[in-house]
């Protein structure tokens, strides 16, 4: 979140303080809505929530890479190293726990991912531009930790599932196929009947199906 809108950090602060799980990525909280840099340290107005201060960022040339190595007994139970490239942020923890460290270069051993307990919640930070596999694993584990319900058990590549819930408890589930061909996907139509679109076990290319239920 490079650019911060006024009031956004206060929403994040209250969300985490009241028990939310928050994930921030590298190079966040740098400028305001007019692209003016914040003074006094970054991520702006979230250093206490995140438990660290950003000190520097290393830009890598094309083809260069570093890696994040999981700390033993880390809270997310990460077991494998992941490569990172392009941008690697160097942070100085205050209260944050180190989840992963960089594997080489002059910042070998410095935090590459952190977790900070703030109020009743937790704030995680990914400090570099990692390969997609890290984000997949971390987001899956954070969703499980937060108790997020999986509406569709298996989501094929190129298919996106989102859900909106009304104040009365009615849920609308949007299933969109961004592939050039139809794909098979098992939808929970017993609980969420088809409200818009046609479904026969597959979703056509570039098609959207909307389910509705509670």
Task: Walk through the language-model features, giving the residues of each.
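A conserved amphipathic helix/loop scaffold
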Residues: 2-214
């Amino acid at each position: 979140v490079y650019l911060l809108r006024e009031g956004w950090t206060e929403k994040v602060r209250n969300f985490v303080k009241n028990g939310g799980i928050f994930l921030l990525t590298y190079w966040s909280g740098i400028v305001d809505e007019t692209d003016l840099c914040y003074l006094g340290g970054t991520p702006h107005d979230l250093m206490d929530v995140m438990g660290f201060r950003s000190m520097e960022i290393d830009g890598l040339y094309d083809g260069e890479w570093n890696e994040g190595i999981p700390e033993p007994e880390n809270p997310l139970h990460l077991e494998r190293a992941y490569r990172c490239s392009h941008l690697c942020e160097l942070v100085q923890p205050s209260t944050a726990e180190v989840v992963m460290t960089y594997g080489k270069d002059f910042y070998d051993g410095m935090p590459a991912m952190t977790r900070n307990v703030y109020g009743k919640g937790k704030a995680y930070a990914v400090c570099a531009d990692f390969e997609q596999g890290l984000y997949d694993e971390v987001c899956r584990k954070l969703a499980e930790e937060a108790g997020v319900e999986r509406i569709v058990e298996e989501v094929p590549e190129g298919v996106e599932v989102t859900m909106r819930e009304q104040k009365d408890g009615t849920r609308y589930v949007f299933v969109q196929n961004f592939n050039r061909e139809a794909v098979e996907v098992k939808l929970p139509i017993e609980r969420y009947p088809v409200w818009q679109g046609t479904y026969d076990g597959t979703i056509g290319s570039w098609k959207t199906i909307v389910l509705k239920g509670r």
